[in-house]
């Protein structure tokens, strides 16, 4: 049976999220699947990916073909790198310790890059919020000045005697 690793659409209109599933290649997009191996939410920044690493690696090793988007997701999670390193171990090119250290180094670099991206997003959000707060403060100050002037004018009108008829 030809199996595919692909995305199954869920969510509402305009806010889709996806389950990463193993399915028969002839099954419809949201039809029956063999196994659900993960979750992908592109609506968050950065996108949220939750994946059963060992199961995805197993299905790749037994011949499941990922779709283009699923391939990108698996690649971002390091599954193709792990598969490549395991093939190197089987051929005798790499030792298991070397493969493990290379994978851990890649994982740490990836984790740092993601954390830097998150920090950059938070910093931009903080700057935007600070600018909004400052503009709101200026608007409130001008409003209070205008109200003070109006109150002053009303007091002056009340203090002046009315013209007699």
UniProtKB/Swiss-Prot annotation:
UniProt-listed GO biological process terms: translation
Gene Ontology CC annotation, any one: small ribosomal subunit
Record InterPro entries: Ribosomal_bS16, Ribosomal_bS16_dom_sf
Keyword Ribonucleoprotein: yes
A Pfam family this chain is assigned to: Ribosomal_S16
The entry's keywords: Ribonucleoprotein, Ribosomal protein
The keyword RNA-binding is annotated on this UniProt entry: no
GO MF annotations, alphabetized: structural constituent of ribosome
HAMAP family: Ribosomal_bS16
Family designation: Belongs to the bacterial ribosomal protein bS16 family.
Name of the molecule in the record: Small ribosomal subunit protein bS16
Lineage summary: Bacteria, Pseudomonadati, Bacteroidota, Bacteroidia, Bacteroidales
């Amino acid at each position: 049976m030809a199996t595919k690793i692909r995305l199954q659409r869920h969510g509402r209109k305009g806010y889709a999220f996806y389950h990463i599933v193993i399915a028969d290649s002839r099954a419809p997009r949201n039809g029956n699947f063999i196994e659900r191996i993960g979750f992908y939410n592109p609506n968050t920044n950065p996108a949220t990916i939750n994946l059963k690493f060992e199961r995805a690696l197993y299905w790749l090793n037994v011949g499941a073909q990922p779709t283009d988007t699923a391939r990108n997701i698996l690649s971002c999670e390091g599954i193709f790198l792990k598969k490549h390193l395991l093939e190197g171990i089987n051929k005798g090119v790499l030792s298991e310790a070397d493969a493990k250290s290379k994978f851990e180094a890649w994982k740490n670099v990836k984790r740092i890059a993601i954390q830097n991206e998150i920090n950059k997003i938070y910093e931009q959000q903080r700057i935007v919020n600070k600018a909004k707060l400052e503009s709101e403060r200026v608007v409130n100050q001008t409003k209070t000045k205008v109200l003070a002037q109006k109150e002053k004018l009303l007091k002056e009108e009340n203090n002046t005697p009315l013209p007699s008829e």
